Amino acid sequence: MTSGEGANSGADPEGFGSSAIDDAARLDAALPDIDWTVPPPGAAASVFRAPSGDLSMLTIGDPGDTRVVLVPGVTGSKEDFTLMLPGLAAAGYHVQTFDLAGQYESAAAGPHNLRPPRPHYDYDLFVRDLIAVLEAGQAPAHVLGYSFAASVAQLAYAERPELFASLTFLSAPPQPGQAFRGVSRIGRLSWLASGRVGAALMIWGIKCNFVKVSPGRLRFVNIRFASTRFESVRDIIALMKRTPDLRRELAASAIPKLVAVGEHDLWPLRLHSGFAREIGAQLAVYRAGHSPCETSPHQLNRDLLALFSRAG
């Protein structure tokens, strides 16, 4: 399914996304269960010294190629893009992804490392870290922000647009302000939960495997939670209740933009479609939930490569 500014939100049977059955969709339908702790062949692990501390990073591809930076969301990590990395590198891109401060193998990074120290993880911390990553390599780069990280990418773009060749928002909050208000079924009650309560509920739900991920994925998720700092999840949930409104700035931008979502995402498709229309972005929808990078990686790569080609 595709849409752009002024387009309708109906499925396009000739387009891509949930309506398309092609080689990418067939590859995704045959995905095996994997050990998510093992990096894909050719990927190198490293540590990036960011303003908030040491960030754990994976890199794949030729450093001379155009750069792609994939940024995971809350309770996530660089491993969420494991199935995407080889395909993007094979297509001729230098791909980097890193754990956010406080998350998984970047757990030691955080506001306590800033000068002066700060009591909470805030938008400025995550934006400074992302800008530092972008400044440290070839720019402009194609940037994908997953869920909460989409807001971070938007803020970084508003401050340093010259660092961005394109923007992709994967399963991103489609509304500014209290982002959880639009979540299907429970959104109208979300204002009752504090950051601490919201974080605890999110972690509990993921550990209980209500979305029925594979055994290998569930094992990795539990390993990751053992390292992730609860305070980082708590603070990010609180930040998502103050999602910035950058729709005007994004709509005025000439760089290619993509809103990529699963048809069973946390937020209803009509909100994602409206967000894409408001900012002049293409919309791609997959037969997936909140994590197309895990369940539809070949289709997502296909659409990213089409987006990148529009950047020249």
What function would you assign to each model-found segment?
Residues 145-149, 153:
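Gly/Ala-rich beta-loop-alpha elbow adjacent to hydrolase catalytic centers
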Residues 154, 158, 164-195:
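Flexible "cap/lid" loop of the alpha/beta hydrolase fold
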Residues 294-308:
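Post-His helix in hydrolase/transferase enzymes
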Residues 178-180, 196-252:
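Conserved alpha/beta-hydrolase catalytic His-Asp/Glu region
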Residues 53-112:
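Conserved HGGG/HGGXW glycine-rich cap/lid loop of the alpha/beta-hydrolase fold
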Residues 258-294:
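Conserved loop-alpha-helix segment in the C-terminal half of the alpha/beta-hydrolase fold
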Residues 48, 96-144:
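Active-site loop/oxyanion-hole signature of alpha/beta-hydrolase fold enzymes
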Residues 2-47, 58:
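An N-terminal hydrophobic leader/cap segment in hydrolases
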